[in-house]
Amino acid sequence: MIAVIGGGASGLMAALTAAEHNDEVVLLERQPRVGRKLLSTGNGRCNLSNINAAPQKYHGADVQFVQPALAAFGVPDTIEYFRGLGLLTVCEADGRIYPWSNQAGSVVDVLRLAAAGRGISLRTDCQVTALRQTAAGFALELGEHRLLADKVIVCCGGLAGGKVGGSGSGYALLQGLGHTCTRLYPSLVQLKTDNTFVRALKGVRAKLPWHQHEHL
């Protein structure tokens, strides 16, 4: 049996992929429902991908770190994968790809239906409090219960989106198995200001130039 910890986008995709090989798959989600954070992505529309996705579009010390992922499962693969699940998509002028319905709920629905169709057991309100390796595989502590699995896929997500379930609980589970964690930094964050004049701008996106070290 394969246990997937986390019922977000990565957890659902991992569970579906594992089930393609006729393995018994159980997905464990600590919240009352799966895909909750997905519902808030793209201002509620769920930005699935971007037709212009490429390593040079990323920023950081090693912009090539995404190359293996894009080579293994690129944008065309993403579009075709969701089409196979019954989800039609639309590409906007700026390259962003959304579900045709413009509703993030459509993405969650097709993933849930696909999981049910492939016999994946979805267990919600089920938090993994500890994870350890055994001679036969892995033991997952679920409060008063224990689950034994041959393989485990950890898809708990990070600290982002605390209001919709982000907790970073997966870090502790992985560190307990001997993995290390680099220092965490916030990425997309709010700017604090007086709400009096900006309340009406909620949900509005704008492309602005960024100046740093005299460079645009």
Residue ranges of each PLM-predicted region?
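N-terminal Rossmann-fold NAD(P) dinucleotide-binding loop
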Residues: 11
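Short beta-strand to alpha-helix junction loop
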Residues: 66-74, 93-113, 160-166, 192-196
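Glycine-rich FAD pyrophosphate-binding loop
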Residues: 3, 19-43
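Receiver (REC) domain switch-region micro-motif
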Residues: 2-3, 152
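Glycine-rich active-site loop/strand segments that organize a redox cofactor
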Residues: 43-91
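Hydrophobic anchor at the start of a short beta-strand
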Residues: 23-26, 89, 152, 181
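Residue-level recognition of phosphate/Mg2+-coordinating polar/acidic sites
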Residues: 20-21, 31-33, 54, 77-80, ...
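Predominantly flavin-linked oxidoreductase catalytic cores and closely associated redox partners
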Residues: 110-216
